[in-house]
């Protein structure tokens, strides 16, 4: 579903709770982007993989699933591309 910006802006002006929720969501997205930039620029390969698995664990736990046992549905290549690492590095 796509909502034109003008409509969303008008509705959020009339509904303070909607505006607050939108700001919270946008803030979370910006924070996530900043964290990813830091991860890719400052961490070594092992730290990148550690943070990736930790974040997955935390997100699974927040959704009511086990934070300790979960299936990685991404391939090694996908994980490597996401983290800026080679498949060989991920495999080690």
Swiss-Prot record:
Q: What induces it?
A: By anaerobiosis.
Residues annotated to bind [4Fe-4S] cluster: 1
Q: What is its main location?
A: cytoplasm
Give every HTH crp-type domain span.
43-92
> Per its UniProt record, what Gene3D superfamilies does this chain match?
Jelly Rolls (2.60.120.10)
**A Pfam family for this UniProt protein?**
Crp
Name the GO terms of the biological process aspect: regulation of DNA-templated transcription
Q: In which compartments does the protein localize?
A: Cytoplasm
Q: Which residues form the signal peptide?
A: none
Q: How is the cofactor bound?
A: Binds 1 [4Fe-4S] cluster per subunit.
Tell me which UniProt keywords the record has, alphabetically. 4Fe-4S, Activator, Cytoplasm, DNA-binding, Iron, Iron-sulfur, Metal-binding, Transcription, Transcription regulation
Q: Which domain of life is it from?
A: Bacteria
What cofactor does this one take? [4Fe-4S] cluster
Checking InterPro entries in the record gives: HTH_CRP, RmlC-like_jellyroll, WH_DNA-bd_sf
| Listed GO CC annotations | cytoplasm
Give one GO term, molecular function aspect: DNA binding
Give the protein's biological function: It is involved in the activation of genes necessary for anaerobic respiration.
- What's this protein's name? Anaerobic regulatory protein
Q: Which organism is it from?
A: Capnocytophaga sputigena
Q: Which gene encodes it?
A: fnr
